[in-house]
């Protein structure tokens, strides 16, 4: 069991791909999500690939629910594979519940690395009703990027009702399995984002949430090519290629879970 952080998003990683290594890992691996460090946002479990990738990634949220994809987790897995010498200079191919994703190394640093993860194409979702809270109606866009996301525009994300509204929207009729809710604001000439993640709550960063916010900005004509999103855990960049695929760029590093704050405070 090893600890990794992607832009402040913390994960426990367990590699079960090799039979002998898998047995040793399983002996030390958390029996359930409740056994992971309280400060971890989820568990990244590597198992043998099914269709020729370097690994298959199974993502479990803090509450035990399954996530189809995770941009910050993908970069952490990519760093792990690069550090083990499994990839070399090529991009890692990682199978997820949302399909195959690629991760490539941008540059190394003393405290970690910057990596670029392919996030697939965004699929817009029509909302059946407006999003309102305490008499305020929000400008909202919904999108699927492996996981469902709802992006709300706010004047100042620091004052947004993230916990209250994020929790209430988990029962929104358009998202029967829950939804990640982003609160996006333009402040100090930067885009700032807070995300209430389904199965976790508010986190220091959400990679697919940053991609959803960048997509919403592009649809609104306020972003193109590359969009930078500032979150509590750091800055993430989202690129669009001509085919419409999104790429998430940000840091990843290995950390000792024993040194993580527990329980973790709000971002």
Language-model segments: what does each one mean?
Residues 1-111, 151-267:
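A glycine-rich beta-to-alpha transition motif near the start of alpha/beta enzyme domains, typified by
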Residues 111-119:
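Short, solvent-exposed secondary-structure boundary/capping segments
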Residues 121-125:
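Ligand-binding beta-strand-loop-alpha-helix segment within the catalytic cores
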Residues 126-130:
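Short amphipathic alpha-helix segments
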């Amino acid at each position: 069991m090893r600890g990794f952080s992607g832009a402040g998003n913390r994960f426990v990683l367990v590699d079960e791909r090799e039979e002998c290594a898998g047995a040793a890992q399983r002996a030390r691996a958390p029996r359930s999500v409740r056994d992971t460090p309280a400060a971890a946002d989820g568990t990244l479990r590597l198992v043998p690939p099914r269709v020729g990738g370097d690994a298959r990634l199974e993502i479990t949220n803090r509450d035990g629910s399954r996530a189809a994809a995770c941009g910050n987790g993908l970069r952490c897995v990519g760093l792990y594979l690069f550090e083990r010498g499994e990839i070399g200079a090529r991009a890692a191919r990682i199978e997820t519940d949302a399909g195959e994703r690629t991760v490539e190394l941008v540059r190394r640093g003393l405290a970690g690395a910057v990596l670029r993860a392919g996030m697939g194409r965004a699929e817009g979702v029509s909302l059946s009703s407006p999003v309102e809270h305490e008499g305020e109606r929000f400008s909202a866009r919904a999108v699927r990027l492996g996981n469902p996301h709802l992006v709300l525009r706010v004047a100042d994300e620091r004052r947004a009702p993230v916990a209250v509204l994020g929790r209430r929207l988990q029962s929104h009729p358009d998202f029967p399995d829950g939804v990640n809710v982003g609160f996006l604001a333009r402040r100090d000439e930067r885009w700032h984002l807070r995300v209430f993640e389904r199965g976790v709550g508010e986190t220091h960063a959400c990679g697919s949430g940053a991609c959803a916010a960048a997509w919403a900005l592009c649809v609104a004509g306020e972003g193109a090519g590359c969009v930078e999103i500032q979150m509590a855990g750091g800055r993430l960049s989202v690129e669009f290629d001509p085919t419409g695929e999104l790429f998430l760029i940000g840091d990843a590093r290995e950390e000792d879970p024993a040194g993580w704050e527990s329980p973790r405070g709000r971002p």
